[in-house]
Amino acid sequence: MAASTMALSSPAFAGKAVKLSPAASEVLGSGRVTMRKTVAKPKGPSGSPWYGSDRVKYLGPFSGESPSYLTGEFPGDYGWDTAGLSADPETFARNRELEVIHSRWAMLGALGCVFPELLARNGVKFGEAVWFKAGSQIFSDGGLDYLGNPSLVHAQSILAIWATQVILMGAVEGYRVAGNGPLGEAEDLLYPGGSFDPLGLATDPEAFAELKVKELKNGRLAMFSMFGFFVQAIVTGKGPIENLADHLADPVNNNAWAFATNFVPGK
């Protein structure tokens, strides 16, 4: 039977197109007709600038045409994939999962790098407030006290800390991948909701869709921030807050360009 498209008039399908193709519509020997309906997936909240074909693109009005597989259905899709990393649907799904998980870890990590140093500069005592130096306290004579309190966790073995981290983080990731754990089962492994949404932020679908975009935007910034913190630690040997204070005090001599020239051959 030739492929055809018809609009159903019933309220349940009003305004939706139903496609009949040779593979989905066949006249059987008994004279019965078998049909399969195909309804397009929702593109996101109506009127949102972050979803759909008219969404915000990576270069705004100067953006070229987006690849056909980037339809604006998912949060954070700005229509840019020069390397074709999202062309395969399974790879795309896996990369989306990895990006969201790494974004969340990066946001926590960036906060952990900055906050102790801010507290230390405002009079709160730490054994070591700089993030990349804190772990080395475990090799000191007194070991490492979490939050400076020996009654919480008094660590003196790097192997014990490593094993504890593997067990705890492995358990959390195992529960996430399996979709079940002490807090119940989750249908969506990236956005489980339920006990993980005690404030009910995801109850409104349109607000939830906007929050997904905000999470990815902040997560991507956090991943770049963590990369910058690593580079700063290697080049200056200082934490991010101290580097910022040095730059504000003397921006001419304390900036990325000034430090980059230190690595020029022959200098």
From Swiss-Prot:
Transmembrane feature ranges: 100-120, 152-172, 221-241
Residues involved in chlorophyll a 5 binding: K214, Q232
Modified residues (Phosphothreonine): T38
Post-translational modification: Photoregulated by reversible phosphorylation of its threonine residues.
UniProt-annotated binding residues for chlorophyll b 2: R104, V153, L183
Residue sites binding chlorophyll b 4 per the record: Q165, R176
GO BP terms: photosynthesis, light harvesting
Cofactor note: Binds at least 14 chlorophylls (8 Chl-a and 6 Chl-b) and carotenoids such as lutein and neoxanthin.
InterPro entries (alphabetical): Chloro_AB-bd_pln, Chloroa_b-bind
Domain of life according to the entry: Eukaryota
Modification sites for N2-acetylarginine: R36
Chain sites annotated for binding chlorophyll a 6: H247, A256
Binding-site residues, chlorophyll b 5: Q165, F263
Protein location: Plastid, Chloroplast thylakoid membrane
Positions that bind chlorophyll a 4: N218
Gene Ontology cellular-component annotations: chloroplast; chloroplast thylakoid; chloroplast thylakoid membrane; nucleus; photosystem I; photosystem II; thylakoid
Transit peptide region: 1-35
Binding site for chlorophyll b 1: Y58
Residues that bind chlorophyll a 3: Q137, L147, E215
Membrane topology, record value: Multi-pass membrane protein
Binding site for chlorophyll a 1: W80, S86, E99, R220
Binding-site residues, chlorophyll a 2: H102
Function of the molecule: The light-harvesting complex (LHC) functions as a light receptor, it captures and delivers excitation energy to photosystems with which it is closely associated.
Domain comment quoted from the record: The N-terminus of the protein extends into the stroma where it is involved with adhesion of granal membranes and post-translational modifications; both are believed to mediate the distribution of excitation energy between photosystems I and II.
Subunit record text: The LHC complex consists of chlorophyll a-b binding proteins.
Name of the molecule in the record: Chlorophyll a-b binding protein 1, chloroplastic
Protein source organism: Arabidopsis thaliana (Mouse-ear cress)
